[in-house]
């Protein structure tokens, strides 16, 4: 989960309260969220869904249904896992609060571990639990598979970062290496929160790369 800057313009289909998944809404959310699932960070999203941060409960809360600020770009896997009562409230709005400031996103070997930095911040705690679940939930065979797909994709990104950091150690003035690192650490990149957290936690080795974390 990464901080997102929304387009303020309200799509026409939302203004008219026709539907929340018409083409204009889909394209705006896809653009604003960089075609990444806002929960797990996978990119591109092959099975996108428009997720309501606060559920509308089949129209019980109609004001939530067409509120652009309540609509998020999600993959089906994460939307399914978030659809539990414990996540009806207190999941971070990543357009309002910066998850990187509040949560540590770590990959240790092939294990994803996500933890709130402040255990008294209920939104950070609940969000960390949700992100942990989308990478680690094993209650059905399909979820085991889909979690592993995300871990595998995350491993590819982390390995690309580590390989590039090795090249950077021996050739830090290489324009190609610098550009590659900037791309890997950009907010728009897949699983950016994990890669950026790695660099921040090793900034004694790479102090100048903190400038790449935009």
Residue ranges and their predicted role:
Residues 132-214:
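C-terminal, charged low-complexity interaction regions
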Residues 81:
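Ligand/cofactor pocket segment of small-molecule handling proteins
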Residues 39-73, 85-101:
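Histidine-centered nuclease catalytic patch
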